[in-house]
Amino acid sequence: MLEFTDKPYQFFPPNPSPTVIRIAHWLNHQIILPGPNHRISELQIDGDERLRELIASGAHILFLPNHSTHSDPHIMSEVHRQLGIPSAFMAAYDVFLRSKLNAWVIQRTGSFSVDREGSDRKAMSTAIEVLKSVRSL
């Protein structure tokens, strides 16, 4: 269930950990996606040959999913895992406030917060820096 907060906005920067990312990818692929909340047993990427060519050429790629379901971040994480590229997600700051453990894990997977109700310049500048440095967002 979604929970929203009236607490003042606090920026949570990305703090990626290769170990946490590997564990998160495994959990997502093996348990979360096929589990009862998502029921996704297989994911096939159409056009992955072209994406792989772009990645090999050093292109920086920005994915803009519609986010029509709660499965979208998990699906995009699996796409990134299959392509072998790092993920970085911009997530509503409310998600980081649900628990300290939740915030810690989300930051270690390379994600950072955004205030969707305002003009969050820190999140925008972070998105640009992440895109410049990791080749995908």
Protein language model regions, located:
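Membrane-anchoring hydrophobic helices of lipid-metabolizing enzymes
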Residues: M1-E78, R98-A103, Q107-S111, T126
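Carboxylate/His-rich catalytic cores and anion/metal-binding grooves
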Residues: S77, G84-A91
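Residue-level signal for alpha-helix termini/capping positions
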Residues: I55-A56, R81, L131-K132
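Glycine-rich anion/phosphate-binding loops
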Residues: R116-K122
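Short beta-alpha junction loops
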Residues: A92-F96
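Short, solvent-exposed loop/turn segments at the edges of secondary structure
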Residues: G84, I106-T109, V134
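A polyanion-binding, active-site-adjacent surface
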Residues: F89, S111-S113
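Conserved Motif II region of HX4D acyltransferases
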Residues: A59-N66, S87-F89, T126-L137
